[in-house]
Design a protein with these regions (language model features):
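Accessory RNA 3′-end/elbow-binding domains used by RNA modification enzymes
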Residues: 1-13, 19-36, 40, 44, ...
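Catalytic cores of RNA-modifying enzymes
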Residues: 1-170, 174-208
Length: 297
């Protein structure tokens, strides 16, 4: 099959790392030019946006990095990883329940500081924290700013387990949030399950399972079934700017266009035929290319 250029939202299966998913797709799609935005822990499932071909250069230019998760917290247990896959560090009887949990969830909303966990890809002095953690080492870390936009109670799937929905900013560790919630309740806590339902502009409704995608790639249907979204999808929050052939030529050659009548700001640009060109900015009536995603020819 011809390698597509675009973004493929996947419902990541449990037990796979984000890198595992890319490795599997490289063989199926016949390209090594793949990337993703927003790593998911192996135990987690849900939205993983895979960037293919020319779209890989758009991964680090995402405008919306906010995420939404459904997380199940198990009270009475604390592990070294912050989830049930880790080694047990502490157990304790649980004397609180749904009522207490509902009462205190709102205190976690808003801007706050969060200490990244040892089992994370955060780098200190050039080394990922998880490598030190696997050696039994603890590295001094600095709390980072995060925002919890919304947090709500959903259900209790098992005794001492509670599922919540969290809408948060990039860099929020739900494993740490689970432990913080437990501490506020006066009991140890860990993450029992995690599902990402939204990542930026991508949601579960756009996602397909890995087996579905592999089958479509093998049959050739992936080229025509619309599962691979256009590159500009990731820039949907920006206003669209349609330019004439003269301005298009300037953009393709990296030349600014003066006296351009558009409000200052950042735009996704299209030619007169509706072909996506790339990103451009307008400042003081001057239109400049920021990043091209189309062919120059």
């Amino acid at each position: 099959m011809q390698t597509p250029n675009g973004i493929l939202p996947i419902d990541k299966p449990a037990g796979w790392t984000s890198f595992d998913v890319l490795a599997k797709l490289r063989g199926a799609l016949g390209t090594r030019k793949l990337g993703h935005s927003g790593t998911l822990d192996p135990m987690a499932t849900g939205v993983l946006a895979v960037f293919i071909g020319k779209a890989t250069s758009a991964a680090d230019r995402q405008l919306d990095h906010d995420k939404t998760y459904e997380a199940t917290i198990r009270l009475g247990l604390r592990t070294d990883t912050g989830d049930v896959t880790g080694t047990t560090l502490e157990t304790a009887p649980v004397t609180v329940g749904e009522r207490e949990l509902r009462t205190m969830l709102s205190r976690f909303m808003g801007d706050r500081m969060q200490l990244p966990p040892m089992y994370s890809a955060v780098k200190i002095n050039g080394q990922p924290l998880y490598k030190a953690a696997r050696k039994g080492q603890t590295v001094e870390r600095t709390p980072r700013p995060i925002t919890i936009y919304n947090i709500e109670y959903l259900s209790s799937p098992a005794p001492d387990e509670y599922t919540i929905r969290v809408a948060c900013s990039k860099g929020t560790y739900i494993r740490v949030l689970a432990e913080e919630i437990g501490a506020a309740l006066g009991v140890p806590a860990t993450l029992a399950a995690l599902r990402r339902t939204q990542a930026g502009v991508f949601n579960l409704k756009q996602c397909h399972t890995l087996p579905e995608i592999l089958a479509a790639a093998e049959s050739g249907e992936l080229e025509t079934n619309g599962w691979v979204l256009p590159i500009e999808t990731v820039f949907a929050p920006l206003l669209a700017l349609h330019v004439n052939e003269g301005v298009k030529a300037h953009l393709l050659n990296g030349c600014p266009t003066s006296h351009y009548k558009a409000a200052d700001g950042r735009y996704r640009t299209y030619d007169e035929n509706g072909t996506f060109l790339g990103l451009a900015t307008v400042e003081g009536g001057v239109l400049k290319v920021e990043k091209l995603f189309c062919e120059r020819g």
